[in-house]
Amino acid sequence: SNANKKYQLPKGVNLMDKQMFCFQCEQTASCSGCTGNAGVCGKTASTAKLQDELTSALIGLAKSCENNPKTENTDRIIIEGLFTTITNVNFNDETLKNMIDRVHKEKNIIVPDCSVCKAKCGNTDDYDLNNIWSGNDDIRSLKSLILFGIRGMAAYAYHAMILGYTDD
């Protein structure tokens, strides 16, 4: 089992040069992540990039709610988006693109002036995931663990929501 191993990038791997990088599931190549055109699970590089883009957009949406009221749809969109990025849930690029668009539209409802602001503050921008992948090993591992944990919780929240149960 790889569950107790601290994740480390293979020597010489620069994530910014790879077509894809995914170490989300137990099928990960050589216990070091999938980095080619497709993962062991069948996820393509384009799908992996769209999942990262969706994650970035979701963080931007969450940041937009820090100082602004969310709408009645915000929680649903965040939960659906997180669920969509879980391992082997959705490898359909069009669905991922549509979800990214929904997240951006929701963010523009919450902070409509940010998309046309001339003095960009960055407070509601999509998050740059390079900040995670290029960071200190321990910080990267911790942030990854938190992200995967939140995605796992979103799976339960998504299924509860489908069954009609919600709770703030």
What is each model feature region?
Residues 6-168:
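An N-terminal assembly and electron-transfer interface module characteristic of large anaerobic redox
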